[in-house]
């Protein structure tokens, strides 16, 4: 018998879309999708039935109301229903379309044909239950930051003969693998991608194959920085970390251990109001913020060693 999932539907003002998506992910949803409805937005989230009871869903509704009130918007409408696994796995896909990000990327759903003669770097993606479709502001900010950091590296998928120093990157909280694949397409020599969610690691493996990335160049593994320490041969050149702010703060000491004086890092998953705490933790361990990019209520920190 198929597993049963909650399908949570939230109709909200468009300005609340990112906040609602973040709230659903924080609630434990394994996938989200959004659809424009005139001036409003319908956001859907999917959660295994055993992870939430009716009281939990009612509490989610209260949190969403509080989020809206805090920024002076009307309360969203929350509904839910039970669906079978095969239904949830495909229902959100109808709302996801090819999306250009930054100056160089196109995120193309795996179930759609790849565009021909396109002048952007195409990332084919089937996120499954993992976070990272390119729709969220934090993912976009990280990809745009990677463009900036790797702008000196040629477009060539193979960087060995490009006359550049090889760039080794760690992707902490890799989700669907979208940032790892983006880094490879921009010319990174190798990416070590870790996530504590085994389903996310599985998704990264699948998307690595979809994009025909050499397995030696993208190495996914289940775990966190402790696993990275075992995988890497030397400190990495770059770090990308798109996870919750509280987790970033906890990991900063360990992340610093896999860096060197020239290492740069990209941190997102951070609400603007949380940025001060994250910056303080980074500065305490020898990092300095070069730029902070904002999109709606989210921010992305581009940092380097002091």
From Swiss-Prot:
Coiled coil: none annotated. Pfam families: PrmA. Keywords: Cytoplasm, Methyltransferase, S-adenosyl-L-methionine, Transferase. It is found in: Cytoplasm. Its EC number is 2.1.1.-. It is an enzyme of class 2 (transferase). SUPFAM superfamilies: S-adenosyl-L-methionine-dependent methyltransferases. S-adenosyl-L-methionine binds at residues 139, 173, 195, 242. Disulfide bonds: none annotated. Gene3D superfamilies: Vaccinia Virus protein VP39. It catalyses: L-lysyl-[protein] + 3 S-adenosyl-L-methionine = N(6),N(6),N(6)-trimethyl-L-lysyl-[protein] + 3 S-adenosyl-L-homocysteine + 3 H(+). One of its GO terms (biological process) is methylation. GO terms for molecular function: protein-lysine N-methyltransferase activity. The keyword RNA-binding does not apply. One of its GO terms (cellular component) is cytoplasm. The keyword Mitochondrion does not apply. Belongs to the methyltransferase superfamily. PrmA family. Methylates ribosomal protein L11. This is Ribosomal protein L11 methyltransferase. It comes from Trichormus variabilis (strain ATCC 29413 / PCC 7937).
């Amino acid at each position: 018998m198929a597993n049963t999932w909650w399908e949570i539907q939230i109709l909200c003002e468009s300005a609340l879309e990112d906040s609602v998506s973040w709230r659903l992910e924080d609630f434990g949803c394994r996938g989200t999708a959004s659809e424009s409805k005139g001036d409003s937005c319908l956001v859907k989230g999917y959660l295994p039935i055993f992870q939430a009871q009716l009281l939990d869903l009612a509490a989610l509704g209260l949190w969403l109301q509080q989020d809206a009130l805090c920024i002076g918007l009307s309360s969203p409408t929350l509904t839910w229903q039970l669906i079978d696994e095969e239904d949830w796995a495909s229902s959100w896909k109808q709302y996801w379309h090819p999306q250009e990000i930054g100056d160089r990327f196109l995120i193309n759903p795996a179930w759609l044909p790849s565009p021909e003669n396109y002048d952007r770097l195409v990332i084919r993606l089937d996120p499954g239950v993992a976070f990272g479709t390119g729709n969220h502001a934090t993912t976009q900010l990280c990809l745009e930051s990677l463009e900036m950091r790797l702008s000196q590296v040629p477009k060539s998928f193979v960087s060995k003969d490009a006359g550049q120093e090889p760039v080794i990157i760690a992707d902490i909280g890799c989700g669907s693998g979208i940032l790892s694949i983006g880094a490879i397409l921009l010319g990174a020599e190798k990416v070590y991608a870790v996530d504590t969610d085994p389903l996310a690691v599985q998704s990264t493996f699948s998307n690595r194959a979809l994009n025909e990335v050499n397995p030696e160049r993208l190495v996914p593994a289940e775990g966190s920085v402790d696993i990275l320490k075992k995988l890497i041969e030397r400190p990495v050149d770059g770090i990308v970390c798109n996870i919750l702010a509280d987790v970033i703060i906890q990991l900063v000491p360990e992340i610093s251990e896999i860096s060197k004086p020239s290492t740069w890092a990209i941190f997102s998953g951070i609400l603007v109001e949380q940025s001060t705490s994250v910056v303080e933790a980074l500065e305490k361990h020898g990092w300095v913020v070069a730029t902070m990019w904002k999109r709606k209520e989210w921010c992305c920190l581009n940092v380097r060693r002091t």
